């Protein structure tokens, strides 16, 4: 701590109002209620009895990895990957363009029936809408 900060701390009386309010600050009764970010898995009754609700308990699903050859470790000495991020143009040219070219050569391409290639004319009913955007980036 610097000299000026120590002098300023001596001049200011009372609690430090600039530091972050965590579960370690405050009186013991408050610290017991504040918690550390864990979700509740039940509730307390009027007789101070805790009732656990089965649906609120997190359930971890772990796959069976017997016979799996890869190890869950990547060495920090491993070389950086050389792949560039996938763009929309690359995705279109790899996934949709071959089917459109094939239909165009066969004479069966219909510009009014683009749903065949995965085009969605409306975003209604979608959980994440691209326009108007309804999700955080």
Swiss-Prot record:
Protein name in UniProt: Large ribosomal subunit protein mL41
Organism of provenance: Homo sapiens
Molecular-function annotations in GO: RNA binding; structural constituent of ribosome
Subunit structure, as described in the record: Component of the mitochondrial large ribosomal subunit (mt-LSU). Mature mammalian 55S mitochondrial ribosomes consist of a small (28S) and a large (39S) subunit. The 28S small subunit contains a 12S ribosomal RNA (12S mt-rRNA) and 30 different proteins. The 39S large subunit contains a 16S rRNA (16S mt-rRNA), a copy of mitochondrial valine transfer RNA (mt-tRNA(Val)), which plays an integral structural role, and 52 different proteins. Interacts with BCL2.
UniProt similarity note: Belongs to the mitochondrion-specific ribosomal protein mL41 family.
Tissue expression as described in the entry: Present in kidney, liver, thymus and testis, and at lower level in brain and spleen (at protein level).
Main location: mitochondrion
Presequence positions on this chain: 1-13
Domain of life: Eukaryota
Localization in the cell: Mitochondrion
A Pfam family matched in the record: MRP-L27
